[in-house]
UniProtKB/Swiss-Prot annotation:
Molecular function GO terms recorded: mRNA binding; structural constituent of ribosome
SUPFAM superfamilies: Ribosomal protein L13
Stored Pfam families: Ribosomal_L13
Gene designation: rplM
One cellular-component annotation, GO: cytosolic large ribosomal subunit
Highest classification ranks of the organism: Bacteria, Bacillati, Bacillota, Clostridia, Eubacteriales
Keywords: Ribonucleoprotein, Ribosomal protein
Name of the protein described by the UniProt record: Large ribosomal subunit protein uL13
Species for this entry: Clostridium novyi (strain NT)
Function: This protein is one of the early assembly proteins of the 50S ribosomal subunit, although it is not seen to bind rRNA by itself. It is important during the early stages of 50S assembly.
Length: 144
């Protein structure tokens, strides 16, 4: 019996649309990362991008549990001395909720060229409208 190795040109990709309104950020992001990687398919191969496309709606209404909304900080560094910039998740969700969700998913994907390729299949929208109707996405309900 031979092991199956997926090839890039043989992968059948689907489009999914997920509404994250009221869902915890980390739980939603982990399930989205699994779909983007293709780990939900029996044809998963670690070194090949076998994942599907995901459209996220209502990113501004994602939930953070406990006191994380006020206490947890979103940090990045400008690479200059003293260049650590930080903003609370409350302010970040008000100004750029798409970035907050995308960043949570990015940190759950592989760090490298394959991970960047997987992240390009993620489309995040602030409201409940998106412009990918031509792809006929399936509505996907998150497990928790």
């Amino acid at each position: 019996m031979k092991s199956y190795l997926a090839k890039e040109n043989e992968v059948q990709r689907k489009w999914y649309v997920i509404d994250v309104e009221g869902k915890p950020l980390g739980r939603a992001a982990s399930q989205v990362a699994t779909i983007l990687r293709g780990k939900n398919k029996p044809t998963y191969t670690p070194n090949v991008d076998t994942g599907d496309y995901v459209i996220i709606l209502n990113a501004e209404k994602v939930a953070l549990t406990g006191k994380k909304l006020d206490q947890k900080m979103l940090r990045h560094h400008s690479l200059y001395p003293g260049g650590l910039k930080e903003i609370s998740y409350k302010k970040a969700l008000e100004s750029k909720p798409e970035f907050v969700f995308q960043e949570a998913v990015r940190r759950m994907l592989p760090q490298g060229p394959l991970g960047r390729k997987m992240l390009k299949k993620l489309k995040v929208y602030r409201g409940s409208e998106h412009n990918q109707e031509a792809q006929k996405p399936e509505v996907l309900e998150l497990r928790y």
